[in-house]
A protein has these predicted regions:
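Short, surface-exposed ligand- or partner-binding patches at beta-edge/loop junctions that are enriched
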Residues: 102
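Rhodanese-like catalytic fold shared by cysteine-dependent sulfurtransferases
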Residues: 2-9, 13-58, 67-98, 107-144
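Hydrophobic beta-strand scaffold positions of dinucleotide-using enzymes
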Residues: 61-63
Length: 144
């Protein structure tokens, strides 16, 4: 129960900037690779994310939804690392390669991206609107 409360507290803390943001985002700028200077954390629209997937063969697609949510479909090539596992420290994100984070509607992946970007992960992208927006854009899904 204590770990659950800690995970919920972490989620609330990380989602606060979303609720309090000014609405400005970097969604209209094209993605740029990290030059090793400062960590990159950007939110991308589904078409931008698809273009990044096609352009960056070293990109790791990380789906932070729960295993039960995969029945809705997943982006081909994505790997499941559930948010709950990350929040409880039982799993971590891959290092040394750029990451595209995916969840149901973009909130959990944004929180994970903010957290790991603050930990020094170099290049992290968040899928705006999550798998719901990806699906609404008519982009390919796979069933697991």
């Amino acid at each position: 129960m204590k770990r659950y409360l800690q995970a919920c507290s972490l989620l609330m803390l990380l989602l606060a900037p979303i609720a309090c943001g000014d609405g400005n985002s970097a969604e209209n700028r094209p993605p740029t690779p990290n030059s090793g200077q400062a960590p990159v954390f950007r939110t991308l629209s589904p078409p931008e994310a698809k273009a990044l997937i096609e352009a960056r063969k070293d990109l790791v697609l990380v789906d932070v939804r729960s295993p039960q949510e995969l029945s809705e479909g997943s982006i081909p090539g994505s790997q499941l690392i559930p948010f709950a596992e990350l929040a409880q420290g039982r799993m971590t994100l891959p290092t040394g390669r750029p990451l595209l984070l995916i969840c149901a509607v973009g909130g959990r992946s944004y929180a994970v991206g903010q957290y790991f970007s603050g930990k020094g992960y170099g290049e992290i992208y968040n899928l705006a609107g999550g798998i719901s927006a990806w699906k609404a854009a008519g982009l390919p899904l796979q069933r697991r």
